[in-house]
């Protein structure tokens, strides 16, 4: 499909730079294909679901993966920024470097040059490989938990570009850009639909008889990359590491067997569950990388509803929601949201999408 089919105009003032407080007071647009749009709030979610339904959350935890450093080469020193993307070993991370032209394979980078240091003093890495679009493989001098502590000391929360270009990261973001149930460290970006949940809302969901299940997909920096291709068939997704346990897979299959619905909180949860589900509609345990790219025409295997924020034009995430609820429906929903003052992107409002195709197990 042509990428320009997923374009739309978004006024800059619709981009949220801070979340609402309390978190669950964000607006929630209920989208049912063929039905009028309904304005609600996130705290209404328990009333929009049924006992026996199941919510699937991504429990990944954002790490301070934005690193500032100096590339050291004999007779030449240059400032370099690195956004860690995906861990591939105890001492190895794939990362996006800027400006990429200043770096070549074999270069050494010392991070924490701006007065910040880890408890060992410095955090150093070697550029082992360099690929396209500024992607590189960094091999750090530290490893394992020691490396994790060093990154936490010298790194910054990697706010999305549409926020970072408007204001610097601050201490509030360390709390705001993290879900209340985050447990598994490794994400470069937050699973932002989950930012709306509070402990009180989670308790109300349980009291309503709605199940809560957790999976892990470590969101990578590739989620911020623009689609440069003119056709969706020419776009390559970056892989992300995820895990679905046997217990969670069995529980979700049981939900469908008794007639309940699976509601994914965020596109990351959806992409992982769909990756773990066979053409027979059975969710299976999963551990590894997924680069699933969902566009209109995809037949959903497991997920019945999706709660998600409002996404960028021409993005892979807007393509995904268009596959889920229909391209025309989503263009209409976004036009409605823009006119009605909804706030967009990571710190913005949310939508609850019902699927255009209710034939659950077709693939």
Curated annotation (Swiss-Prot):
UniProt KW keywords: Cytoplasm, Queuosine biosynthesis, S-adenosyl-L-methionine, Transferase
One cellular component term from this protein's GO annotations in UniProt: cytoplasm
Compartments it resides in: Cytoplasm
Any one GO BP annotation for this protein: queuosine biosynthetic process
Pfam family, one: Queuosine_synth
Function statement: Transfers and isomerizes the ribose moiety from AdoMet to the 7-aminomethyl group of 7-deazaguanine (preQ1-tRNA) to give epoxyqueuosine (oQ-tRNA).
Family: Belongs to the QueA family.
Designated name of the protein: S-adenosylmethionine:tRNA ribosyltransferase-isomerase
Protein encoded by which gene: queA
């Amino acid at each position: 499909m042509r990428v320009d089919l997923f374009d739309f105009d978004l006024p800059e003032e619709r981009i949220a730079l801070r979340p609402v407080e309390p978190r669950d007071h964000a607006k929630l647009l209920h989208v049912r294909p063929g039905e009028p749009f309904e304005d609600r709030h996130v705290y209404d979610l328990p009333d929009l679901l049924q006992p026996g339904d199941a919510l699937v959350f991504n429990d990944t935890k954002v790490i301070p993966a934005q690193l500032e450093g100096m590339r050291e080469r004999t007779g030449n020193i240059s400032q370099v920024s690195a956004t860690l993307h995906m861990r591939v070993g105890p001492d190895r991370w794939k990362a996006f470097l800027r400006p990429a032209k200043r770096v070549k394979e074999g270069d050494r980078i010392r991070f924490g040059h701006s007065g910040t240091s880890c408890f060992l003093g410095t955090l150093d890495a070697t550029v082992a490989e360099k690929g396209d679009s500024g992607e590189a493989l960094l091999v750090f001098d530290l490893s394992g938990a020691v490396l994790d502590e060093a990154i936490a000391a010298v790194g910054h929360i990697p706010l999305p570009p549409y926020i970072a270009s408007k204001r610097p990261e601050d201490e509030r973001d360390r709390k705001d850009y993290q879900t209340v149930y985050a447990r598994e460290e490794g994400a470069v970006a937050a699973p932002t639909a989950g930012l709306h949940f509070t402990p009180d809302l989670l308790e109300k969901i349980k009291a309503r008889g709605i199940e809560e299940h957790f999976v892990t997909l470590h969101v990578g920096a590739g989620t911020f990359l623009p689609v440069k291709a003119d056709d969706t068939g020419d776009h390559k997704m970056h892989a992300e590491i995820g895990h679905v346990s046997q217990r969670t897979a069995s529980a979700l299959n049981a939900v469908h067997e008794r007639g309940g619905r699976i509601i994914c909180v965020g596109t990351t949860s959806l992409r992982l569950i769909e990756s773990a589900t066979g053409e027979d509609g059975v969710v299976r345990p999963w551990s590894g990388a997924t680069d699933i790219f969902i566009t209109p025409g995809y037949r959903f295997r497991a997920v019945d509803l999706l709660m998600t924020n409002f996404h960028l034009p021409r993005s892979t995430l807007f393509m995904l929601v268009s596959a889920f609820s229909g391209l025309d429906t989503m263009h209409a929903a976004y036009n409605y949201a823009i006119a009605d003052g909804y706030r967009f992107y990571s710190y913005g409002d949310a939508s609850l999408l019902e699927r255009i195709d209710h034939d659950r197990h077709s693939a």
